[in-house]
Structure formats: C-alpha cells, structure tokens
C-alpha cells in the first residue's frame, strides 16, 4: 500500500506554480500518494492564512506556498517555525536572491504574471479572428476588425493578415473579384480601417502560375492571364477610389515590409 502525504498549496493568486512543482516532484515518488485536495487560492489576509495553516498542522500536512506579500510570507514562516509545520516557501528565497543581485524589491502584486499573459491571449484571439474572417468568410466580422485588407487573389492578404494578427491586430480580408458583388456590409465599414493591396500584373501572373503548379494544375488559364489580371487590378482600383482606401503595392515586398507599411498608413490616418 502506498504511503500517503497530505499536501496543502497556498497562493495569493491562482496557485498554478505550486501545483506544477508538486506534479513534477510527485512524479519522482511513484510509491507515494500525494493527496492535494487542499488548494487555497487568492489568500490575501493573515487571518485567513493562519486558519489554513492551523488546519494543515492538524492534518500533519506538507504545505507549499507561492505567496508574494511580505506580510503573509513572514506570518507563514513564523507559524511554521513556532509549530514545526512542514512548510515550503517557493517565492521568498528567489526574491532574496534577486534582491541581493539587483538591489530591487519585488512589487508584491499577486497575479502579475497573468496580467502579462493577457497580451499573449490577446494575440491568440487575434490569430483566431484572422483565421475565422480570412478570404471574405463571414463579412459580419469586418465591423469588429482593426484592419480590413482588400485585394485581388495572391496579393499577400492572408500571410499579411496572419503576421499582423501575431502582433495583436484583429485583421479580416476580402478578395476582390469583378464578377462577385461586394458584401453590403462594406458600406458600414470605417474607411480608416481599410487598406488595399496591389501587385504588378507580371509578378502576379508568376505567383499565380507557381501556385497552380504547386497544386499540380496547368497554368494556361484566365487566372494567370496578364490581360485578365490587369482587368482585376483595374476593378480593384475602382473600389479603392470609391471608398477612399489607401493602396500599398506589394510587388517585391516581404510580408514584414507590407505589414510595416500598413501600420504606417493606419498611424497617418488616426
């Protein structure tokens, strides 16, 4: 029968750090059952902390904490020294090392890492947005966009959308095809958020031919015909003029360069 150890984890935030450490450590003791039913998050007062520590002492538990408040850290340390409670403070020793090295005190703000993580989650949300509203899918999403890219096929709309999404911009894009009516919702779109992309007919023809070849298809189609491409570009220019949309020529430009120019255009208009 496995030996059982009761573990209390205490944090003034979510407590994920202590949970991860416990999971890593327990993996090294396959013959011990760690009972971690007591996970106390958002502990912010000394009174609440001491009640938890008293219960842990009664249960003869091992206590792991990730507190950042000096007041709470001191209270827990004094309690464990006075009572013999088996207590591990994960944060204070690291804080002391940093303070000794840099001479800077911690800000003692619980949950700070999760605030920083918001930027990451905002980026993920922007990427999901770009995927959802790529290539004119569900035009209703245009109104929620930070940027709407418009252009004929193969003018880098999708890769530029994804690049900008990785920087936190909510980007949708719309392919312009002469035979396909524009979505009515375009009339409601803020012109300040729209950017047109164009490319030289010759370069566009080469890009489209390469695309068809990669799919194992022949390239003798209207899709790669320079005259047809010129017609598409002329139509796109009409749309850009109608809505007052600034235009960026992506010929021989990298995705990064195009994205930089787009942000520059937006800054000029705002």
Curated annotation (Swiss-Prot):
Coiled coil feature spans: none
Superkingdom classification of source: Bacteria
Signal peptide: none
Catalytic activity: N(tele)-phospho-L-histidyl/L-threonyl-[pyruvate, phosphate dikinase] + ADP = N(tele)-phospho-L-histidyl/O-phospho-L-threonyl-[pyruvate, phosphate dikinase] + AMP + H(+); N(tele)-phospho-L-histidyl/O-phospho-L-threonyl-[pyruvate, phosphate dikinase] + phosphate + H(+) = N(tele)-phospho-L-histidyl/L-threonyl-[pyruvate, phosphate dikinase] + diphosphate
Sorted UniProt keywords: Kinase, Nucleotide-binding, Serine/threonine-protein kinase, Transferase
Transferase found in the keyword field: yes
Binding-site residues for ADP, renumbered to this chain: 151-158
EC number(s) per entry: 2.7.11.32, 2.7.4.27
GO molecular function list: ADP binding; ATP binding; phosphotransferase activity, phosphate group as acceptor; protein serine/threonine kinase activity
Summary of the function given for this chain in its UniProt record: Bifunctional serine/threonine kinase and phosphorylase involved in the regulation of the pyruvate, phosphate dikinase (PPDK) by catalyzing its phosphorylation/dephosphorylation.
Membership in a protein family: Belongs to the pyruvate, phosphate/water dikinase regulatory protein family. PDRP subfamily.
Protein's UniProt name: Putative pyruvate, phosphate dikinase regulatory protein 1
């Amino acid at each position: 029968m496995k030996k059982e150890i009761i573990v209390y984890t205490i944090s003034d935030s979510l407590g994920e750090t202590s949970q991860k450490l416990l999971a890593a450590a327990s993996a090294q003791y396959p013959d011990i059952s760690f009972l971690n039913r007591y996970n106390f998050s958002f502990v912010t007062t000394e009174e609440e902390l001491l009640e938890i520590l008293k219960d842990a002492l009664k249960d003869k538990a091992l206590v792991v904490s990730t507190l950042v408040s000096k007041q709470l850290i001191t209270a827990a340390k004094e309690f464990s020294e006075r009572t013999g409670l088996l207590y591990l403070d994960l944060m204070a020793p690291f804080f002391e090392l940093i303070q000794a090295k840099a001479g800077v005190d911690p800000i003692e703000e619980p949950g700070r890492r999760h605030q920083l993580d918001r930027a990451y989650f905002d980026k993920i949300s922007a990427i999901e947005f770009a995927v959802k509203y790529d290539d004119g899918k569900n035009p209703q999403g245009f109104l929620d966009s930070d940027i709407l890219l418009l252009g004929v096929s193969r003018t880098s709309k999708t890769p530029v959308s994804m690049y900008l999404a990785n920087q936190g911009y909510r980007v949708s894009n719309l392919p312009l095809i002469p035979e396909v009516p524009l979505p009515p919702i375009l009339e409601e779109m803020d012109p300040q958020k729209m950017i047109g992309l164009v490319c030289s007919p010759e370069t566009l023809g080469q890009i489209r031919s390469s695309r068809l070849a990669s799919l194992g298809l022949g390239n003798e189609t209207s899709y790669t015909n320079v005259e047809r491409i010129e017609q598409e570009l002329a139509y796109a220019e009409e749309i850009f003029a109608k809505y007052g949309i600034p235009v960026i020529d992506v010929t021989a430009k990298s995705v990064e360069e195009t994205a930089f120019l787009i942000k520059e255009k937006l800054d000029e208009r705002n």
